[in-house]
Amino acid sequence: MHKVAKILNTLAGHRVVLVSHGVGETLSCRHGHFQDATVSEDEEVLVLHGAYYTLFAARHEVEIHPDELSIVFSRFNAFGDPIANAFVFCPGEDQTSPRDILREASVALAEAR
């Protein structure tokens, strides 16, 4: 996980594209930038601080400026590398559960269509 954070830190400030699997559909996120990447104490969550990203829904774009974006790695590929299959959007001091945040994002995208 620390190797992943180190790699992501080399991308800080550059445009990167991430894909997350939300509730019922895939949410595509294009990041304008993020400040840095760190790993949680339990080494299960990678956090991108100062992330800026855009959610794409058909022809509509919803810009979001959270304080951080948490990436939960919950499975591994054949080489043992972590594969991110859930990106959790956590603005500031929001205590909403990751499932609720992804559900809200899916609803927002559906309504935008």
Can you say where each PLM-predicted feature lies in the sequence?
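Short beta-rich binding modules
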Residues: M1-L8, A12-R113
